[in-house]
Every structure is written in C-alpha cells, then in structure tokens.
Amino acid sequence: MKIAVVVQRYGQAINGGAELHARYIAEHLARHAEVEVLTTCATDYVTWRNELPSGVDEINGVPVRRFRVKRERDPRVFGRRSDRVFERSHSLGDELHWLDAEGPTSPSLIDHLTTQGDRYDYCLFFSYRYYHAYHGVRATAARAILVPTAERDAAIGLTMFQPIFRGVRALMYNSHEERTMIQAVSGNIEVPNVVVGIGSDVPQNPQPARFRRKYEISGPFAVYVGRLDKNKGCPELFEFFQGYLHDPSGSLTLVLIGDSILPVPAHPRIRHLGFLDDTDKFDAMAAADLLIMPSYFESLSMVALEAWALGRPVLANGKCDVLKGQSIRSNAGLYYETYAEFREALRAIEHNQWLSTALGRNGRQFFREHYSWPVIERKYLDMFARLSGEPAGARMDPLPGWLERRRQNLPAAEEVLAALPKGPSPGERRNSAVTAVTETRADSVPTPSPGTAARRESRPRPGSSSRHRTPHGRGYGRSRGSGGPAR
C-alpha cells in the first residue's frame, strides 16, 4: 500500500500544529506502508516564500517531494478578500479568489496529483482551508482522505468547502467538536469518518529537576507552551495572571515557552524562556504544577494531551469548544470563561494537592486510552481496510460554470459560523471518579468538579464574548471581554 501525505509545509524545523501532525502521521504510517510526503518549498506560513529546493528529499526515512509556490502571499490582497467573503454576501468566484490569495499557490503540486495520483492508494490531505487541499482533493477524490484540522473560525463558513467535506472518501477528525461542526455546515454525516487526533512521543522519564537547575526556577509554577500570539489568547492570559498576582495566598510563577510576537509583561513571576527543544519542553511540563491553555481556537490541543500524558492537570479557556470538551471527556482539566473562574480554578489546583493529583491521574489514563500511538495507528489502518472493501464512487460535486460562480448569492461566512452549534460534543467515556469524590469533599479552598468551570456567578453564555479571528488557521496549541481582574 502506498500513501501520499499532502501538507502545506513539512520539515523537522517546522513546528506548526498541522504540519507537525502530518509529519508524525507520515513517520508512524511508514512502519506499515510505503509513504511519500508531497509539500511545498515554503517554510514561512505568512509569506509562503520558496526557501527550500524543489525535488525529492528524505526526512527521518520518509521521502519528501517538494513543489515550488507560484507567488508569495500579498497580505493586503488577502486582507481585502478575507473581509469580502467573511463579512459580506459574495460569490463563489470571490471565495476561489480568497483561496488563491491565501495560498500556498502551487499549481505544480496539483499537476503532480492530477497526473500521478493513481500511483497512490490513498492521499491524506492535511488542513482543509489551503490551496493544496482544496484543489488536491478535487484532483484525487476517489482516493482522498481529509484531515481537516478545522477550527471554529470564519473560513469554515465558506460555501466552497462544503462539496470537499462531502466528496472525499473519508475524514479523520481531530475532535468530536470538529466533527459536529463540519457535519453541521456540510451535511456530510454519511461520509466514513473517525475521531483520531494525534499522538505524541512523550518521554517516559523526563527530568523536572534538570529543568529547574538549568533555568533557575524554584517554587510552584504554571506553564504555557506555544506561540505567544493574540490568536492564542495570550493577552487575556497576561491580564488574568497579573490579576492573580495580587492574591497574597498565591505563589505560582507563570513560565512561558515559545516564540513571541507580543510584548511580555515585566514581572519577576512571569518568565519568558523562548523556544525550547523537546527535552527542555518536556522537562518543564513535568516540573510544572499545571499547564494553562488560553486559546480561543483549536482543532486539537496537542500540548494539553502531552501535559496529560505527563500527569499534569490543565486549566483551559472554556470559550474554546474543543478545549472545554477535552476537559470534560478526560475529567483531567478545569476550564474558565471569566477572570473570577480563572482565579478560583488556579487557586484550587495550587492549594488542593488531592485534586491536582487526581486530575493528573485521569489525564494519564485518557491519553493512554485514546492518544497513544498504537491507538492512533490502528484507527488509520482500520480506515484504510474499510475503504479497500468499499467502491470508490465519484461523489465530488463539479465546480459550477463561469456565470454561476459570479452570482452574488452566498452569505457572509461569519453569519454561517454564528449559526453553527456551539459547546462541547459527547465523545469518549468520561472518567467520573474525581467528580464523585470532589462533590462530597470539603477543603479550605473552593474545589470545582473537574471538567467544569470553577465558578458560576456572573457567567456569560458560552460564545458570548467579543469576536476573535485567526487569519492563518493555526489550530493546535502546540510548542504549535468583560470580567477581567480588578486593578
């Protein structure tokens, strides 16, 4: 069996969520099949500049075939086209122009799939919203399997993607929330699918003391791992944690790991360490009292899964359906929607060792049952086996003609997004052991039930916060309003 893994960027130094996801899957499937990666020569997801040579390379034993990007992204053109399709009624032609402006525009990659696609038994396309996936799926519909990596942002409301979701052979979803959202927007419930997610190569014996010595960190701390970016919720994290610092009973330091495009508050209990290699990152997570995930947009939080694999509790932004759903299903995390909830959840994990330990124990079990590599690999292999026994009927709707593409009859994508169902979706079995005990246990610190918000007073309706938009579809939380603290 020969598998093509098709993704916008690829390489050991490329740590974007979907790109790392694609590399992990390619390397693990290579143990069971012949795998070739098809990608571009770009390394920068903003410009798509050609920085690597075209042709065939090899990374960790997997052949990688690179194709040139025809032109770099023009941010002004992309911004104008985004405003048009996201905020106003528009045409299918407008959406296709938006896709072309977003990139990475690589006709040579699509030509390869069109002429050589029958060399592969299946083509795995990562990230639905990019040029390579949209046109590549259309070129190889009879063997196309889509890993959407979709977030709850406006791009999901574009009409052009609905035939893609309905026309592939199968979909491998990252989360139950992602599946619910895509099925609601496209009506593709009959397409074979499974919630898979992604595993991680978490070390068996990380060295927390080594991290503390190397970076001279003593005392309890919370860790954030990922890009320090507005779209990751970091401004709100900074605001909320600075409010927590006024609490005389709190002693946590906030340790930030990842490259930053934001100014980091200057405070002795806020430490920005920059980008760390995996050894230091996992040592840091093992040393931390908890991981904080403040992002509004995720299709899957890889870093939360890694924290759970290491037995660390997670405090997550409850305005992100995926993070909220993961916390509920795992019973290994708390979530917040306001500063009051953030503060009380942080206090609970900091001061209640029993709660922290129980959350971490549940996290280990959740990761082992649903995200260990044997589980992930088996889900892919089972899907390949299922599809091999079914006819590959052509279900892809053809593109309309030139005149139909010009009709200004499509709704603003933001309006479509607003109408989609919200909230966490049911999924894997929930471990209720912690909840059953915490509801009857009295401690000096308020103890929220795991998988629930810390406090309920003045709680807004989920999804009622001010709108946030991510322009690049970064959806993983990995090494990728009102209710603020009183001043």
Residue ranges and their predicted role:
Residues 1-68, 118, 244, 403-428, ...:
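N-terminal subdomain of nucleotide-sugar transferases
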Residues 143-154, 161-207, 217:
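Donor nucleotide-sugar binding/catalytic pocket of nucleotide-sugar-dependent glycosyltransferases
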Residues 215-232, 238-242:
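Conserved donor-binding/catalytic core segment of Leloir-type glycosyltransferases
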Residues 258-283, 290:
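Nucleotide-activated donor-binding/catalytic signature segment of Leloir-type glycosyltransferases, i.e.
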Residues 296:
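Aromatic "clamp/platform" in nucleotide-sugar-dependent glycosyltransferases that forms part
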Residues 313-317:
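Short hydrophobic beta-strand element within catalytic cores of glycosyltransferases
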Residues 364, 369, 374-440, 447-448, ...:
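C-terminal amphipathic helix plus adjacent low-complexity
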